[in-house]
């Protein structure tokens, strides 16, 4: 992700935001921005990891937000569906679990010491 972000920044120096597929990529994008001396571009990601929440708490961090998934809720939903299958019950072919946006304004509500 670091090399990809460096390439993007080289080809698109006026980019204003980077959206990453996960929090680890966001950290790499932030590193690439720092190496390029770019302190204006913001970074968004998906996961809601404890590390990215710590970054969100920093006033000067370019990490602007993450869409938080809940491994706990995902696991509970998976077990519920597995039990339905084992019991021969009907189940949805596709299912979803709610996610939520974390940003600098609401990260304190969720804490930075774990997953939701």
Give the positions of each predicted feature:
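Short beta-strand elements at the ligand-binding edges of bilobed clamshell
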Residues: 58-72
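Hydrophobic alpha-helical
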Residues: 1-55
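Structural detector of well-ordered beta-strand residues that form the stable sheet scaffold
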Residues: 19, 42-44, 64-67, 102
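Residue-level signal for well-ordered alpha-helical positions
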Residues: 32, 58-59, 113
């Amino acid at each position: 992700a670091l090399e990809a972000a460096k390439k993007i920044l080289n080809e698109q120096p006026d980019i204003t935001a980077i959206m990453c597929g996960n929090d680890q990529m966001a950290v790499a994008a932030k590193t690439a921005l720092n190496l390029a001396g770019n302190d204006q571009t913001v970074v968004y990601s998906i996961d809601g990891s404890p590390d990215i929440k710590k970054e969100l708490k920093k006033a000067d961090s370019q990490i602007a937000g993450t869409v938080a998934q809940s491994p706990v809720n995902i696991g509970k939903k998976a077990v519920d569906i597995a039990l339905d299958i084992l019991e021969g019950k009907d189940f949805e072919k596709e299912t979803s679990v709610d996610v939520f946006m974390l940003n600098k304004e609401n990260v304190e509500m969720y804490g930075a010491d774990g997953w939701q």
